[in-house]
C-alpha cells in the first residue's frame, strides 16, 4: 500500500496471459482503491415520466470549467456486507428522502467507471418511485453532504447531457438506459 487516508493507492506487479497465448512481461500499476463498491439509483416516477436528480459539490470536478457542482443520480457506498439492493434503498432515503421496498428496484448493470486505474465497481438500479412529495434538500451532515434535490422530465434530463450540464458517467448511463428501455421498464414496474 503506497498511500491510505480517505482513499488508498496500492501498487501491483502483474503479468497476464496474452491473446496470442504468451505471457506478458511483469509490469507495475498503481490502483486507486475504495474500501467498498458502490451503488447508483435512478429514481423514476412511471406516472409522470420524471426522474429525481441531485446536485452536489464534487472534489474531482474542482477544476471543471463550468462548476464543481455536478448533477447526478443518487449514489453511495455499500456498507459492510450489505447487498447492493439494501444500499440502494438506504441511499435513496438518505439523499432524496424517498422510501421504497426492494421489489421496486430493477438492477440494470454493474460498471467500472475507470478500470485503468480504479477498482470501484458500481451496481446501477432504476427505482420505481412516487416523486410527488420530493423535497428540495438531502444528504447527511456526518458525511459532509449538502445535496440539492429536484425533479426533471426524462427527456429534459437527456437534453442536459448533450448541453454538457450532466457530466457524471453513471448518470448518463442510467438516463440513456431508461430512454432506450422505457417500455420494458414500465412493464416490469406494473
Where are the regions that the model predicts?
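Acidic, metal-coordinating catalytic segment for phosphate/diphosphate chemistry
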Residues: 2-48
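Conserved Nudix-box catalytic region and its N-terminal flanking loop in Nudix hydrolases
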Residues: 32-33, 42, 50-90, 112, ...
Amino acid at each position: 500500500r503506497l498511500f491510505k487516508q480517505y482513499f488508498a493507492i496500492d501498487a501491483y506487479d502483474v503479468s497476464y496471459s496474452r491473446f496470442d497465448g504468451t505471457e506478458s512481461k511483469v509490469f507495475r500499476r498503481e490502483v486507486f482503491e475504495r474500501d467498498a463498491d458502490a451503488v447508483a439509483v435512478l429514481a423514476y416516477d412511471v406516472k409522470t415520466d420524471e426522474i429525481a436528480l441531485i446536485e452536489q459539490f464534487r472534489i474531482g470536478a474542482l477544476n471543471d470549467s463550468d462548476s464543481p457542482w455536478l448533477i447526478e443520480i443518487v449514489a453511495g457506498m455499500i456498507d459492510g456486507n450489505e447487498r447492493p439492493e439494501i444500499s440502494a434503498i438506504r441511499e435513496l432515503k438518505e439523499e432524496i428522502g424517498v422510501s421504497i421496498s426492494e421489489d421496486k428496484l430493477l438492477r440494470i448493470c454493474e460498471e467500472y467507471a475507470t478500470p485503468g486505474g480504479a477498482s470501484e465497481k458500481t451496481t446501477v438500479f432504476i427505482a420505481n418511485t412516487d416523486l410527488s412529495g420530493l423535497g428540495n434538500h438531502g444528504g447527511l451532515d456526518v458525511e459532509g453532504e449538502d445535496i440539492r434535490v429536484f425533479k426533471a422530465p426524462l427527456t429534459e434530463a437527456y437534453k442536459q447531457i448533450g448541453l454538457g450540464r450532466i457530466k457524471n458517467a453513471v448518470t448518463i448511463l442510467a438516463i440513456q438506459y431508461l430512454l432506450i428501455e422505457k417500455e420494458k421498464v414500465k412493464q416490469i414496474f406494473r
